[in-house]
């Protein structure tokens, strides 16, 4: 039986979905009847517009996407479809796109349930009504916590008092209609209030229809037909029921009245509707739909203009700031080509009307710099000479090849994207500046839509179907990363599940339906939307989970569709590290540097990089990057740009990496079909490694800037099912017309397709390469300050505090060792600090590297406020004894225990056992009367070496004593297990047996199930490659080991060393209770 057969029955004759095999024959017949083609009888069917329909953005209520709903509405011949998600417009832009694709007109609306249980739908009539609806939604959402809303009648009335409503209101009577609710709605909306008659083939439909018509007549309201639609097709009922169970956190079997009685809340064929509703009610829905003339695509958006001083236009002020920036960037005068580029860009920016947007980004960057917050622009904006002149980006246009079309062009529809990184610890200051500058009414973060993935979906679905927790865990593991290319049915069978079991079939079928189904809104990582008018007139605003944060209900794709500009204020840990390192270098070593003034093209720094001595630096610290460095051997800045970009899915999938390396190493000749291509690809040896190069190639062949940008977007969409064939045909024709060989054209197009996977634009890679060089220079020349800054910037990066300290203490042939001193309550501050050493005077007299004193921030369970009290009390006068420390720093029992466990009292009372005893007896030893003799200190033996190391890792996360593997080395020798030093003496291809502490597990998307594991022993790190078949066979050892033993083949090629695993087994028992940090699958 095939996998599709096992999980689902698929009806290919109708748009949209799958029908679980567990359905009855009657259900199948009903679903089939839904989809009878209406072409032959179209003229005899009643017209209809659905005015009450929830999409999947009514989270855990709506079962179908806007795309599915509009496809179904088109199939059924509806004249219009209203998307009316509950107190939300989060899915409305997707509705707009689906409307465009199908030709079914979109009506914008929203459903509400007030605190007194009055239910109604608001439909937008015109441009005046849209901001009214957005404001009502915003009021309800801002009055409640994340994901909820709260609205009363008073709030609704306030929005429509003294204004002409631009919306229609549909009253949704309950099972027991309360006439008073309809009367209230009519008082607020007058003749714009309607009574919605919703019938779902239940026993009392006839009586309900009669009662509602009578009620409408009594109230003087017009009645119309609507469907309370929750799904596109009847077959989706099982999905909708499951969502209901998830929403109520109940098993399906216990949901009872929470579930709908039948599957009628779908988009029904007009024939079926004609058999249920009087023709007049159906016609009334069409007539009201015709009155709703609002077009969402016509929403007008204006960017703030208050940054423009009096006497200036936005264009003139932007030019003034740009020219001032040019003088600062090029004191001797900018090169002529740069001046021309800037003039061209300013003209284009003015043509597109984006001047105020650039001014806003410049203002945010100016604020950050004034507060000494490191920041740097990246992404496609680094193609802009104006951004460089304004200080937004750091890529000098006189030193690199820019392609403005990658960022902005006259024909390009989407708005420009400017990403700016800020120190991750201080980014909140920047966000709050934006809120303060523009007001919370005009600034909010974009949303991110959190969707179900396989593992999260199967957990929720299996729980809804009543599967026991242990079986849920087993089933969820089948969707985990560690399954390689094993077919799903095999994974499930191997986990012990019966694929013939109808319950398992239903769970799996619903899980497949819920993949990529929206689960809830979250906040974007930093994309700010700022408007000249209140944002709630443009899009609803709601509270984020974090305090003092608000988000709009649209995500970045919605913003692009609606042509809204966002400023991306992103957080980058390495900027925090670099700023703290530069402060330490300035304060302790007497060297005053910025990123821009660090000595460039330093041979010693590149030598360190070539040896892959890059633990803790930016971007090139991963195992994959480290494996590339000895092969690529960067010698100059542009090599770092290539290094940043080449270890990405795009170049790997496009088979660009190995040809580039062969050419770089001289194993393959470099040739170009024309001087024009050589100008574009010369620096990358004929291989297109960057998106800009692809765009330049096709522009050179004959594409316009706009067509080249469309190719870029097609590349991004190709992996998601987009069509590249039209581009293949066009590129082949254009390049053949220039005389290029078919082999070259095919090679280039395959490489272009590789960019369908994630790849960096050159501008982005160049921006990141600036930080790569800065962090590497600091690591090479100021290793103590760099390690200290890196520790103080945690959590960030690939490596734990333990690995950072081990690397600093170990040093390398290219880098001095750093002494690290333990945490000490008499000497440590909150942050790690530098002590001793000798300041730098010149390159000839570089001074002496200081030591690092570990800070109290490293102590688990100790808060910064407690440490502030300790440091303040210590500054007043030295602590006389433990009792004095506890009294003057007001240490509670938790803090006392944390200090004792961390060994931070060594200089006061001695070993850990003595510290524990002293802290435990602080209260008991306090004299009852002044002058009473103190109890004599008890001398306790020190813990054994293994116990000390265990306690270090438990309390501080690292140890300055022996490495755990050094303690275990005698046992390793007995087992004939090698250490790194012995391993490095072995020949390439040798069979070896090693073991180490697991510090990282990685599974790149391009690795086809291969797992990369990093082991650590007392001499360094060992890279292990585990093929997918072994990963499956030794899954438990691979995933759960703290101490992993590996038998395999040692390989050493071009300076790259790794171990190909042949077998794995777990030796964690040798570590006892020791828990070690491991960074897994990030």
UniProtKB/Swiss-Prot annotation:
Major enzyme class: transferase
Subcellular location(s) of the protein: Cytoplasm
Origin species: Xanthomonas campestris pv. campestris (strain B100)
Catalytic activity: DNA(n) + a 2'-deoxyribonucleoside 5'-triphosphate = DNA(n+1) + diphosphate
Classification lineage: Bacteria, Pseudomonadati, Pseudomonadota, Gammaproteobacteria, Lysobacterales
GO biological process: DNA repair; DNA replication
Keywords tagged on the record: Cytoplasm, DNA damage, DNA repair, DNA replication, DNA-directed DNA polymerase, Nucleotidyltransferase, Transferase
Single GO cellular component term: cytoplasm
Family: Belongs to the DNA polymerase type-C family. DnaE2 subfamily.
InterPro entries for this protein: DNA_pol3_alpha_NTPase_dom, DNA_pol3_finger, DnaE2, DnaE2/DnaE/PolC, DNAPol_HHH, NA-bd_OB_tRNA, PHP_dom, Pol/His_phosphatase_N
EC number from the UniProt entry: 2.7.7.7
A Pfam entry, by short name: HHH_6
Record's keyword annotation contains DNA damage: yes
Name of the molecule in the record: Error-prone DNA polymerase
GO MF, one example: nucleic acid binding
Role: DNA polymerase involved in damage-induced mutagenesis and translesion synthesis (TLS). It is not the major replicative DNA polymerase.
């Amino acid at each position: 039986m095939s996998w599709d057969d096992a999980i689902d029955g698929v009806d290919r004759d109708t748009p949209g979905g799958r029908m679980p095999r567990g359905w009855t024959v009657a259900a199948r017949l009903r679903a089939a009847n839904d989809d009878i083609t209406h072409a032959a009888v179209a003229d005899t069917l009643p017209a209809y517009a659905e005015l009450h329909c929830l999409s999947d953005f009514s989270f855990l209520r709506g079962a179908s996407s806007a795309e599915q709903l509009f496809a179904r509405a088109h199939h059924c011949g509806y004249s219009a479809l209203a998307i009316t998600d509950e107190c939300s417009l989060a899915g409305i832009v997707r509705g707009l796109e689906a409307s465009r694709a199908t030709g079914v007109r979109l009506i914008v609306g929203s459903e509400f349930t007030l605190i007194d249980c009055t239910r109604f739908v608001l439909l937008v009539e015109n441009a005046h009504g849209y901001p009214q609806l957005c404001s009502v939604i915003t009021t309800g959402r801002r009055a409640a916590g994340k994901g909820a809303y709260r609205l009363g009648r008073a709030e609704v009335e306030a929005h429509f008092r003294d204004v002409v409503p631009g919306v229609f209101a549909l009253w949704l009577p309950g099972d027991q209609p309360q006439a008073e609710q309809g009367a209230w709605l009519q008082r607020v909306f007058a003749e714009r209030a309607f009574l919605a008659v919703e019938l779902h083939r239940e026993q009392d439909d006839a009586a309900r229809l009669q009662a509602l018509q009578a009620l409408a007549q009594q109230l003087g309201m017009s009645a119309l037909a609507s469907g309370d639609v929750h799904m596109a097709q009847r077959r989706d009922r099982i999905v909708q029921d499951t969502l209901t169970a998830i929403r109520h956190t109940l098993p399906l079997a216990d949901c009872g009245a929470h579930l709908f009685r039948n599957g009628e809340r779908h988009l029904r064929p007009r024939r079926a509707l004609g058999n249920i509703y009087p023709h007049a009610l159906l016609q009334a829905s069409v007539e009201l739909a015709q009155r709703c003339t609002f077009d969402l695509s016509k929403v007008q958006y204006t960017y703030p203009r208050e940054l423009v001083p009096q006497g200036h236009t936005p264009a003139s002020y932007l030019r003034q700031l740009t020219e001032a920036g040019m003088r600062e960037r090029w004191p001797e005068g900018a090169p002529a080509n740069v001046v021309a580029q800037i003039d061209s860009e300013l003209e284009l920016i003015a043509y597109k009307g984006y001047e105020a947007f650039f001014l806003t980004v410049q203002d945010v960057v100016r604020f950050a710099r004034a507060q000494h917050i490191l920041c740097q622009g990246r992404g496609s904006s680094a193609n802009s000479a104006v951004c460089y002149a304004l200080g937004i980006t750091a890529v000098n246009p006189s030193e690199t090849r820019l392609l403005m079309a990658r960022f902005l062009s006259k024909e390009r529809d989407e708005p420009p994207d400017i990403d700016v990184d800020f120190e991750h610890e201080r980014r909140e200051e920047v966000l709050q500046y934006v809120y303060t500058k523009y007001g919370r009414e005009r600034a909010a973060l974009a949303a991110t839509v959190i969707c179900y993935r396989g593992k999260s979906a199967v957990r929720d679905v299996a729980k809804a179907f009543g599967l026991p927790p242990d079986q849920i865990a087993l089933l969820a593991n089948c969707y985990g990363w560690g399954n390689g290319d094993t077919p799903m049915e095999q994974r499930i069978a191997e986990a012990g599940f019966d694929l013939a079991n109808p319950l398992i079939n239903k769970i799996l079928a619903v899980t497949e339906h819920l993949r990529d189904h929206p689960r809830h809104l979250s906040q974007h990582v930093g994309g700010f939307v700022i408007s000249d008018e209140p944002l709630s007139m443009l899009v609803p605003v709601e509270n984020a989970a974090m305090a003092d944060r608000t988000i709009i209900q649209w995500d970045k794709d919605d913003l692009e569709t609606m042509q809204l500009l966002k400023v991306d204020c992103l957080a980058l840990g390495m900027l925090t590290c670099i700023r703290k390192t530069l402060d330490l270098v300035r304060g302790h070593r007497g060297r005053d540097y910025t990123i821009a003034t660090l000595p460039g093209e330093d041979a010693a720094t590149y030598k360190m990089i070539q040896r892959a001595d890059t633990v803790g630096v930016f971007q090139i610290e991963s195992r994959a990057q480290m494996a590339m460095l000895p092969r690529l051997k960067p010698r100059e800045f542009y090599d770092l740009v290539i290094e940043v970009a080449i270890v990405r899915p795009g170049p790997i999938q496009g088979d660009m990496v190995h040809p580039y390396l062969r050419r770089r190493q001289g194993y393959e000749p470099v040739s170009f079909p024309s001087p024009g291509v050589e100008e574009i690809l010369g620096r990358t040896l004929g291989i297109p490694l960057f998106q800009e190069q692809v765009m330049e190639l096709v522009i050179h062949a004959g594409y316009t800037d706009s067509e080249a940008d469309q190719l870029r977007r097609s590349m991004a969409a190709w992996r998601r099912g987009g069509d590249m064939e039209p581009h293949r045909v066009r590129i082949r024709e254009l390049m053949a017309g220039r005389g290029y060989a078919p082999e070259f054209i095919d090679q280039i197009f395959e490489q272009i397709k590789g960019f369908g996977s994630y790849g960096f634009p050159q501008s982005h890679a160049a921006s990141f390469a600036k930080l790569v060089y800065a962090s590497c220079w600091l690591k090479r020349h100021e290793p103590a300050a760099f390690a200290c800054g890196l520790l103080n910037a945690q959590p960030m990066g690939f490596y734990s505090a333990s690995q950072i300290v081990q690397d600093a203490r170990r040093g390398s042939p290219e880098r001095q060792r750093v002494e690290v001193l333990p945490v000490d309550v008499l000497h440590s501050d909150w942050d790690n600090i530098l002590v001793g050493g000798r300041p730098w005077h010149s390159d000839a007299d570089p001074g002496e590297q200081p030591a690092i004193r570990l800070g109290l921030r490293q102590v688990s369970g100790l808060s910064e406020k407690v440490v502030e009290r300790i440091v303040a009390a210590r500054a007043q006068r030295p602590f006389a004894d433990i009792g004095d420390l506890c009294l003057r720093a007001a240490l509670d029992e938790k803090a006392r225990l944390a200090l004792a466990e961390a060994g931070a009292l060594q200089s006061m009372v001695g070993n850990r056992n003595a510290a524990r005893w002293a802290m435990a007896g602080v209260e008991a030893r306090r004299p009852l009367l002044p002058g009473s003799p103190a109890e004599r200190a008890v001398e306790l033996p020190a813990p054994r070496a293994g116990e000390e190391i265990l306690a270090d890792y438990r309390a501080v996360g690292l140890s300055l004593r022996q490495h755990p593997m050094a303690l275990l080395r005698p046992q390793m020798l007995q087992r004939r297990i090698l250490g790194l030093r012995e391993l490095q003496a072995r020949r390439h291809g040798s069979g070896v047996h090693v073991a180490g502490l697991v510090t990282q597990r990685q599974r790149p998307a391009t690795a086809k199930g291969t797992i990369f594991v990093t082991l650590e022993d007392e001499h360094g790190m060992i890279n292990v490659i585990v093929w997918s078949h072994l990963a499956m066979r030794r899954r438990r050892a691979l995933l759960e080991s703290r101490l992993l033993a590996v038998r395999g083949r040692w390989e050493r090629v071009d300076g790259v060393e790794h171990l190909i695993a042949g077998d794995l087994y777990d030796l964690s028992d040798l570590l006892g209770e020791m828990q070690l940090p491991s960074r897994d699958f990030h």
